[in-house]
Amino acid sequence: MPVLRDRIPRRGFFLGLALLAALSGCSSTDTFEQPVPVPEIEASVEFERVWSMSVGDGHDGDFLYLAPLVTGDLIYAASADGELYAVATETGEVAWESEFEDRIFSGLGGDGQNLYLTTENADLVALSREDGSEVWRTSLPTEVLSSPQSNGSLVVAQTTDGKVLGFSATDGEKLWQYDGSVPVLSMRAAAAPLVGGDVVIASFASGKLIALTAASGQPMWQYEVGQPQGRTELERLVDVTGQPLVIETAVMVVGYQGKLALVDIRTGQEIWSRKASSLYSPMIGGGQIYLAAADGEIIALRGSDRREVWTQDRLAWRQLTQPMVYEDYLVVGDFEGYLHALDREDGSLVGQREFDDEGIRVPAQRLANGNLLVFGNSGKMAVFQVKPQD
């Protein structure tokens, strides 16, 4: 289950993981269950490793989401203890590595010139893509868990207390700030903002999706993904923690105890919606929508009418990552560090591999060459191909 945070004004405040894991499964619609054991399957596909390496101590025991940044020929990766790497996508050869003096709190964002990250002390830092050297840094009001995002001229960071801030990509000058509202209790996770040329779209723990002008941070529209219901703060959780998925002139978004919806990116008008509860963005492939529900079910929906095609419940409550489409398969990771491959046609479990005994929290990423990049909580990073067994 995801870790929760409450609004105590203290940076880096962590609540007890075991207690919160139990609490976070409780809601007005879900009953907390223990994660099912790793299912025994008859595997027909395998995860064939192309290359692997270690990125420092990974999340180093903290509840972070240090997703690597993939940019064509290079993968940029960071660990909480300050190790930075630029790695060749094809071979895993290290192009450069750097020791960062601060503790890192967010995954990497980037543009054509710089990489961007945030620190435990709530600094936004720009680094050179050439060698990882520091270009500029600026202070933030409080901690940021999601990766800063940039359109090349504007860098946007979203704090855990609901502030969205825009900075100049050139020198870090603060350009604007939007103050969103957040509930007393929320998940210890946050969606990275979407940053386009004219619009910034931010997701909030209040269940709101809000579009801001990139030039000034002024609100353009807002959409309610989830509406708090119930008497307790736990029942009223409606966090949107997955980055919205852009589909031409619309965005697809899902919330915890909320809904899955397609929204017009220009106006915020709902195109369609259906009830759903998830902490990760949906995935699209072959005309279908794939969703890892908060209770561990994986659901395939027909894109044309959102009717269920299949549901896989053999990974219940295993804290699954966002599904990733790989050819005829769907790949998810879980809290015990297993990778699972599902047949996209019927959702059956067809492959399995233990990857990182500290767990997998960051969703797998598809590389330009078609391979699969996986980053584990301990800092293990590897590229796989998913193939039928010989």
From Swiss-Prot:
Coiled coil: none annotated. Keywords: Cell outer membrane, Lipoprotein, Membrane, Palmitate, Signal. Gene3D superfamilies: YVTN repeat-like/Quinoprotein amine dehydrogenase. It comes from the Bacteria. Its main location: membrane. GO terms for cellular component: cell outer membrane. SMART domains: PQQ. Residues 1-25 form the signal peptide. It is found in: Cell outer membrane. InterPro entries: BamB, PQQ_b-propeller_rpt, PQQ_rpt_dom, Quinoprotein_ADH-like_sf, WD40/YVTN_repeat-like_dom_sf. A lipid is attached at residue 26 (S-diacylglycerol cysteine). It is a lipid-anchor. GO terms for biological process: Gram-negative-bacterium-type cell outer membrane assembly; protein insertion into membrane. A lipid is attached at residue 26 (N-palmitoyl cysteine). Part of the Bam complex. Belongs to the BamB family. NCBIfam families: assembly_YfgL. Part of the outer membrane protein assembly complex, which is involved in assembly and insertion of beta-barrel proteins into the outer membrane. This is Outer membrane protein assembly factor BamB. It comes from Marinobacter adhaerens (strain DSM 23420 / HP15).
